[in-house]
């Protein structure tokens, strides 16, 4: 969650009421710079993050055994999905997360 919040806040955290920039502010934007497309999942890859083209400015981290962190800064949203998922079910889990993200971004 904290990792997602770091990116949601443009690379900054608030400690004792003081905003501190931990990452250069341009780095978060760089993370969204698409360097590859995945035609199977209809996602794009940036700098160490996946990007969902249908959710503008999203950042998505995929982790071990089907864990996900989804960041949509404009909606102040960080979704974290912890749980073990069989490989065959992961596309369905990702699709469900995308549907949630789309509903939130269209509010």
Positions of PLM-derived features:
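Active-site-proximal binding-pocket segments
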Residues: 1-33
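Active-site-proximal alpha-helical segments within enzyme catalytic domains
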Residues: 1-13, 67-83
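Short acidic-hydrophobic sequence patches enriched in Asp/Glu that either
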Residues: 19, 23, 41, 93
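Arginine residue identity/basic-tract feature
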Residues: 19-20, 32, 81, 90, ...
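Active-site Gly/Thr loop motif
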Residues: 25-78
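A short acidic/small-residue loop/turn micro-motif
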Residues: 85-87
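Short, gly/Ser/Thr-rich active-site loops of penicillin-recognizing serine hydrolases
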Residues: 90-107
């Amino acid at each position: 969650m904290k990792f997602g919040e770091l990116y949601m806040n443009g690379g900054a955290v608030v400690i004792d009421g003081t905003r501190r920039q931990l990452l250069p502010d341009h780095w978060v934007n760089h993370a969204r710079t698409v360097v590859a497309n995945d035609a199977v999942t209809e996602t794009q890859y940036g700098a160490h993050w996946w990007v969902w083209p249908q959710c503008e400015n999203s950042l998505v981290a995929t982790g071990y055994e089907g864990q996900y962190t989804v960041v949509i800064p404009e909606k102040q949203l960080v979704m974290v999905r912890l749980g073990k998922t069989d490989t065959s079910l992961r596309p369905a889990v990702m699709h469900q997360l995308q549907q949630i993200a789309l509903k939130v971004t269209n509010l």
